[in-house]
Amino acid sequence: YVLINDKEVNGYTLDKFEPLKLLDPITEDRNTLRYSMIPSLYKVYEYNKAREQKEISIFEIGKGFYKKGEVYGEDTKLCVLMSGKYSTGLNNNKTVDFYVIKGIAEEVLDYLGYAGRYSFMKQEMPKEMHPGQSAMINVNGSNIGMIGKIHPSVTRDDVYVLEINLDELFTKKVGKMKYKEFSKFPSINKDIALVVDKKAISKDIEKVIKSAGGSLLTNIEVFDVYTGVGVGIDKKSIAYSLTFSDMKKTLTDEEINELMDKIIDAISKKCGAELRK
């Protein structure tokens, strides 16, 4: 539904809007046009949870409405909400976390032509979002959305959301699509688990890994983040899947091992990371 309670109109946003209330609402719970789509999807989540659904992944492309002074407007938005486990086709037991919702945002932005032109910024977040597990999505210097975990004051469940203002996004000039030839030689995957400071930012570590791996490192993906027994109170473990390939030949084990040693040395010196044993 595009209708929410008027008390929710300024939820999940740092902006302040006047409620766009209906003159004759059917119910007071749905008496106002929404601005953020997250309250709508959260109601769908609660409906399904009440019916014993534990693995919930939903999305919507729809409208958000606002009134600021004498200005009325509406924006087209994409909203995703996920909780529990989900199927990737490869691993049916993957638990949704910050990096899963971040990966979805990256795939959407890359597909739309914004690869390399966005970043995830740790800034002031709406009070409904967990400050330690949320970020603004910034494209060309402007915030066009956010990702993260819903604050424990709202729900004790691990619920993650993504919201992108598509109208705002599409005002940013899209880079030209370029064809990239795929290697006809097999790629090689290597996993690496690192123990780093709890406040370490994965994107910074990925930059060091990419720099050390060079052109033969074709993909980096976070597949696990762990805190708890075995990694230290002020530490966390981040596991990465690294893909290597060469356009001209099949890489040897010796070449891969040399690259891995170079990567490990770089992240140890620049990020203070240790291999998880």
For the regions a language model picked out, list residue spans one by one.
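A carboxyl-terminal module marker
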Residues: V9-G11, N91-K277
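A general structural signal for short secondary-structure junctions and capping/turn motifs
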Residues: R30, N48-E52, K68-Y72, K127-E128, ...
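Conserved alpha/beta core surface patches that mediate binding of polyanionic ligands
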Residues: V2-K7, Y35-S83, V161-G175, G214-V231
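Long hydrophobic segments that form regular secondary structure
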Residues: K49-E52, I58, G64-V71, V80-G89, ...
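Extended, well-folded interaction surfaces typified by the phenylalanyl-tRNA synthetase beta subunit core
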Residues: Y1-I56, K190, T243-M247, L251, ...
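Residues forming anionic-ligand binding surfaces in small-molecule and nucleic-acid pockets
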Residues: E18-L23, K63-N92, K184-D191, K235-S245
